[in-house]
Amino acid sequence: MLPARVRLLTPHLLLVLVQLSPAGGHRTTGPRFLISDRDPPCNPHCPRTQPKPICASDGRSYESMCEYQRAKCRDPALAVVHRGRCKDAGQSKCRLERAQALEQAKKPQEAVFVPECGEDGSFTQVQCHTYTGYCWCVTPDGKPISGSSVQNKTPVCSGPVTDKPLSQGNSGRKVSFRFFLTLNSDDGSKPTPTMETQPVFDGDEITAPTLWIKHLVIKDSKLNNTNVRNSEKVHSCDQERQSALEEARQNPREGIVIPECAPGGLYKPVQCHQSTGYCWCVLVDTGRPLPGTSTRYVMPSCESDARAKSVEADDPFKDRELPGCPEGKKMEFITSLLDALTTDMVQAINSAAPTGGGRFSEPDPSHTLEERVAHWYFSQLDSNSSDDINKREMKPFKRYVKKKAKPKKCARRFTDYCDLNKDKVISLPELKGCLGVSKEGGSLGSFPQGKRAGTNPFIGRLV
């Protein structure tokens, strides 16, 4: 099940995230209705029988289940609303979905997303979830556009999505922080930007902090006033379940996910969100979701004993002494340095003239947030693109560390600490290692189980 830091995911926002990924492995740049009627798999012969109408989610009445299945083959998102003809056959998809959402919103436990429709019945270009403050751009069919969600402000959705070519000039300033996206990719693959799913927006704002960051912020903000020892504590599934049940009792409208536990404090390999019908695979020891495993109304096939890889034994920096740093202060120092780097990366991306002459390129979507920070700063320091930071390039690094990180005593020999093999240069793996950045869950090398102390540095910056 999702760990505590992401269990506040509201049901309909989870659905929004799923819609951001192409369904069923199809990689199309246009609506599914463009599939030809001559396509045999989607054109089964429907025998003439007594009509048994079905009202579907596109607002149309289908005369039989066979005709409905034919339409669903072309549009996998199509669903049955009720048996019988639609009450208003001329009702648009947006108005139908809005009516359904308003009906569901009457239930006190649901924080429902209600779509906004134009005078002609089409979806308005900007849609918002009033309960969380998130807004995003949608296609004419109402599908959320990857990379467009913002919180507490209106996204810039300029013109029809398919009318605007992909711009190259601003590519260095646009970053899609799509950490959560691959979790809900139905075919397990990474999201593929297309003309439909990756539009270009005017303005200088960073595109799409995902709801993954939103819930990291919620979780990490709760750790702000706790000491480092408490923030490192690994909670068992039983503890997380009790905490979730208590939060669900206090906040029944938030759609909180309740983890299912196995003996010994472990998580069951399959976790589900009952309100939405979504299930996914997790690591049984941490509850961390596995990307690409989310399904709806179908139980995913999960490994029964998938566990987090132990990096502590392979981390040469874990017990490495930082000369001059007071005992027990290394973690605090590295946390403050990483937070400062994160802040500067966001400001650089969001500025009209990024540092380094616009050298920041679209990051690898498989990277964690802290990996992206490490890669970004390494590219700033490596001015000659030699894939290492030499003695000359190390000077601004030393000045930065002394200025930004605390306690100051830990900064004096930090570059020596990073130079693991003592060859007088710092490689990218060495920089990531001394910053405690690891593939699994962000900062694991220096921060046990990936839990960093203090406030998440993206509060107020990415959302």
Curated annotation (Swiss-Prot):
Q: Quick check: keyword Metal-binding in the entry?
A: yes
Tissue specificity statement from the Swiss-Prot or TrEMBL entry: Widely expressed in many tissues with a strongest signal in ovary.
BP term (GO), one: cell differentiation
As one GO molecular function, the record gives: calcium ion binding
Cleaved signal peptide residues: 1-25
| Gene from which the chain derives | Smoc1
Residues modified by glycosylation: 224, 384
- Cystines in this chain: 42-73, 46-66, 55-86, 94-117, 128-135, 137-157, 237-261, 272-279, 281-302
Q: What does this protein do?
A: Probable regulator of osteoblast differentiation. Plays essential roles in both eye and limb development.
One GO cellular-component annotation of the UniProt record comes to:
basement membrane
Please report the PTM annotation for this entry.
Answer: Glycosylated.
Q: What happens when the gene is disrupted?
A: Null mice present with a phenotype resembling human microphthalmia with limb anomalies. The phenotype includes aplasia or hypoplasia of optic nerves, hypoplastic fibula and bowed tibia, and syndactyly in limbs. A thinned and irregular ganglion cell layer and atrophy of the anteroventral part of the retina is observed.
Specify the EF-hand domain's residue ranges: 369-404, 406-441
What Gene3D superfamilies does the annotation carry?
Answer: 3.30.60.30, EF-hand, Thyroglobulin type-1
Q: Does the keyword Magnesium apply?
A: no
Please report the name of this protein according to its UniProt entry. SPARC-related modular calcium-binding protein 1
Among InterPro entries, the record links this protein to:
Dev_reg/Prot_inhib (IPR051950), EF-hand-dom_pair (IPR011992), EF_Hand_1_Ca_BS (IPR018247), Kazal_dom (IPR002350), Kazal_dom_sf (IPR036058), SMOC1_EC (IPR037639), SPARC/Testican_Ca-bd-dom (IPR019577), Thyroglobulin_1 (IPR000716)
Q: Where in the cell is it found?
A: Secreted, Extracellular space, Extracellular matrix, Basement membrane
Q: Which residues form a coiled coil?
A: none
- Show where the Kazal-like domain sits: 36-88
Binding sites annotated in the UniProt record for Ca(2+) 1: 382, 384, 386, 388, 393
A Pfam family this chain is assigned to: Thyroglob_assoc
Q: Which intervals hold domain Thyroglobulin type-1?
A: 91-157, 234-302
- Listed binding positions for Ca(2+) 2 are 419, 421, 423, 430
